[in-house]
Amino acid sequence: MTFYLLRQRLLLLFLCLLFPVVLSAGNASSLNVVILGDSNTWLGGEYCTGQQGWTRWFVDRFRPATCRSYARSGATWTHTAATRHDLRENTERLSDNNVVFNQIERLIDDCNKGRQIEPQLIIISAGTNDAWFPKQRAEVLSCSVAQAFEEPDSIFSHRTPETVRSLAEVVRYDCTLLMRIFPHAQIVLLTPMQSTAIPDLRLFAVAETIAQCGDQLSLSVVRQDKESCVSSARERTARCFTTDGTHTNIEGARRNGYYLANRISSVLQW
């Protein structure tokens, strides 16, 4: 085989391997995306333009029709005995009502009032604060995933927010709510990235709970705790991709945003 023919075949093979990725990214151009989460998502701003947030770089590569973030700094999945439906609170700190559930409620309210296009893709990136603040979220790991899915949907769906306090229960509660209201939307769960502020075993326990809930609900899960550029061991030695061991700097946000665009493109169902 001549060098010319070999080069042509290698080029053809490369294009064949590249085509599914390009096709997947192209499909995103018609998608309206909504992102829920905590501070690393909130850093990108409501319309995903902040360079220190991964969402800005995600949009740059994923190129959806629209992308809006409802994330809040300090947000958790888990609830407390005082958690209530709350559309108004806008704090950047841990609080009873600064939870993913209320981000969902704001999304639903905005869609009902014509302020937000119904999303085809919903991404939820949370869990850092659930692992970080065990005293304020004491019941985070109080229930196993198996226990959280024992109650029939017909009963579980009627529970009120303050009665759903463990991480496993809340992930089920929030995701099934989204599935009822937006039945055609694809939901992707992102586990939290590693952090120097959180013992690795505790963070991994939170991430594993989220991942197992995703499996139970047949949702795609991206394991940021295992795959992202942020390593707690490396950040303890020197700040490479974070400003403080938890929150991404611009380079960390860029790498993570591009990585998430590629990973989510690979599981896109549209």
Regions found by a protein language model. Give the residues of each.
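Catalytic His-Asp segment of secreted/periplasmic serine-dependent ester chemistry enzymes
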Residues: 46, 82-87, 192-270
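Active-site segments of SGNH/GDSL-like serine hydrolases
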Residues: 125-129, 172-207
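Boundary at the C-terminal end of the N-terminal hydrophobic targeting segment
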Residues: 24-30
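A general structural detector for well-ordered alpha-helical segments in enzyme core domains, enriched
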Residues: 54, 103, 167-170, 174, ...
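N-terminal secretory signal peptides that target proteins for export/translocation
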Residues: 1-7
